[in-house]
């Protein structure tokens, strides 16, 4: 599943977008959170036109967006992602085929018949490197271009129906994505 992402500046009509979101652009930097997505507006010089105007970046979880901001622990298929892309274009004018991605998270949820902590405790190394703790929910390996995370999804989202769900996730940075 695809989950978290962060974009570069988007070619949007920020006045219309801020109006649609109900956001007043009255300071240098404005952030607005909506159902797992965070719209970040920054007043800056547009390098294409040379004018001072608000530019917008988007980050967050497309998976949470589908669940109205509640969680990202259930199934999220490619068809769900395609529907989100259509909604983002229809509702906010965000064109997925020209949106610059700075990073993207993808992973898998695995329902286990036992606690995910058993798997987490058994995982020691990734390519000869030790994992670091991720609070009390899991472990991660940080490289320059990506992060590998293994954690207890039920513990993270604190929802009983996702008990014993192990999440294995990679957060890939732009330079990692370009290599592939």
Regions found by a protein language model. Give the residues of each.
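Structured, helix-rich domain cores that form ligand/interaction pockets
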Residues: 1-180
């Amino acid at each position: 599943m695809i989950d978290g992402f962060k974009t570069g500046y988007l070619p949007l009509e920020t006045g219309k977008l801020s109006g649609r979101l109900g956001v007043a652009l009255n300071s240098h930097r404005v952030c607005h959170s909506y159902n797992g997505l965070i719209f970040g507006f920054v007043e800056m010089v547009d390098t294409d036109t040379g004018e001072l105007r608000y530019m917008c970046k988007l980050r967050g979880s497309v998976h949470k967006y589908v669940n109205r901001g509640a969680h990202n622990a259930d199934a999220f298929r490619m068809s769900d992602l395609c529907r989100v892309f259509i909604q983002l274009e229809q509702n906010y004018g965000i064109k997925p085929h020209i949106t610059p991605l700075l990073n993207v998270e993808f992973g898998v949820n695995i329902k286990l018949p036992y606690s995910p902590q058993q798997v987490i405790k058994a995982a020691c190394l990734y390519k000869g490197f030790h994992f670091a703790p991720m609070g009390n929910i899991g472990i991660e390996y940080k490289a320059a271009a990506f992060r590998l995370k293994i954690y207890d999804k039920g513990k993270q989202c604190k929802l009983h129906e996702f008990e014993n769900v192990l999440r294995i996730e990679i957060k890939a940075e732009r330079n990692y994505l370009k290599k592939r």
